[in-house]
Curated annotation (Swiss-Prot):
Gene name as annotated: GET2
Family label: Belongs to the GET2 family.
Subunit text: Component of the Golgi to ER traffic (GET) complex, which is composed of GET1, GET2 and GET3. Within the complex, GET1 and GET2 form a heterotetramer which is stabilized by phosphatidylinositol binding and which binds to the GET3 homodimer.
Membrane topology: Multi-pass membrane protein
Protein name: Golgi to ER traffic protein 2
Chain intervals with Basic and acidic residues compositional bias: 56-67
GO terms classed as biological process: protein insertion into ER membrane; retrograde vesicle-mediated transport, Golgi to endoplasmic reticulum
């Protein structure tokens, strides 16, 4: 169907421009935009180039639709936790032990930690871990796992050695006390307990209990002196007191009252001598039980 013939004389200038624009758009829509563009560009040139392509002839890219299903995410990306971001300028710590040791190292480098509760807590943990020996500079600054393992094994060995020597002394004390008691009981017919003071003050020929207590006191002095000498030479005398409830309570209280740190060595020494007194009281309790059984038998 041909377009109707329009008298151009009767058309105004605006209508002429509109008709020309519509004709150009109709030609462009038929795929001739590239040819027309090349004709315009090649005017005045002896060689025609067809390397230019109009944007009207280019295929439009498909617009992504928001109604489409999203891409399925890999399940491993959900189950695998993201890696922990290390601090700036530092490597990522391997485990909680290294973090704790790093905190101890920073606490050991501080000059004045008396008013810092966190520093006092770190110091208390370090003292409990290290036993009776004070933490040296090399011990607090080391980050070598082999060194930390050695310190842990040394602490376990000292604890085992301490229990072993206590058990040995317990066997010796009980054996000596029983031997002293049964020796007098078997060899002396009048060996028995008495409630009267004048009987206990008699000589060993008339009342052999006095001779028994003389030997008992002598052996106790020898055993206590040997116990102190051996434990002090092995470095175990004060180590047994570091895990006592009193020193732990003082370490906790020193976070509030730092003055308690000055009294801890005195309390530790008192607990050590109290342990020696406990040896004598324990052996004396055994003697009381033996004389009680002897009185019940007679």
């Amino acid at each position: 169907m041909s377009e109707p013939v329009v008298d151009t004389a009767e058309l105004s200038a605006e209508e002429k421009k509109r008709l020309l624009r519509e004709r150009r758009q109709a030609k462009m829509s038929k795929g001739k935009a590239t040819a027309r563009l090349n004709d315009i560009l090649s005017q005045g040139s002896s060689v025609k180039t067809s390397g230019v392509k109009s944007v009207l002839d280019q295929e439009k890219e498909a617009t992504p639709s928001h109604d489409e299903d999203p891409e399925i995410q890999d399940i491993t990306e959900i189950t695998t936790p993201p890696p922990r971001t290390p601090p700036i300028g530092e490597d990522a710590p391997q485990d909680i032990d290294k973090i704790f040791q790093s905190m101890l190292q920073q606490q050991g480098q501080g000059a004045d930690t008396a008013g810092d509760p966190f520093a006092q807590i770190m110091k208390m943990f370090n003292q409990v871990e290290g036993g009776d020996s004070p933490p040296s500079e090399s011990a607090t600054s080391t980050q070598d796992p082999a060194e930390l393992k050695y310190r842990q094994e040394l602490l376990e060995y000292n604890t085992y050695n301490q229990k072993l020597w206590k058990f040995r002394f317990l066997l010796v004390r009980v054996s000596v006390t029983l031997f002293n008691f049964f020796y007098h009981y078997i060899n002396l017919s009048n060996f028995h307990a008495s409630n009267y003071a004048y009987v206990r003050d008699l000589s060993s020929e008339k009342y052999p209990v006095r001779d028994f207590f003389t030997w008992f006191a002598t052996t106790e002095v020898v055993l206590v002196a040997a116990y102190y000498s051996i434990f002090h030479s092995l470095g175990l005398f004060h180590a047994a007191n570091q895990n006592s409830f009193v020193l732990k309570a003082m370490s906790m209280g020193s976070m509030v009252l730092p003055q308690l740190e000055h009294y801890k060595p005195l309390v530790a020494r008192f607990l050590g001598y109290y342990e020696l007194l406990g040896i004598v009281l324990g052996d004396l309790s055994l003697v009381i039980v033996l004389f009680g059984l002897l009185s019940f038998a007679n």
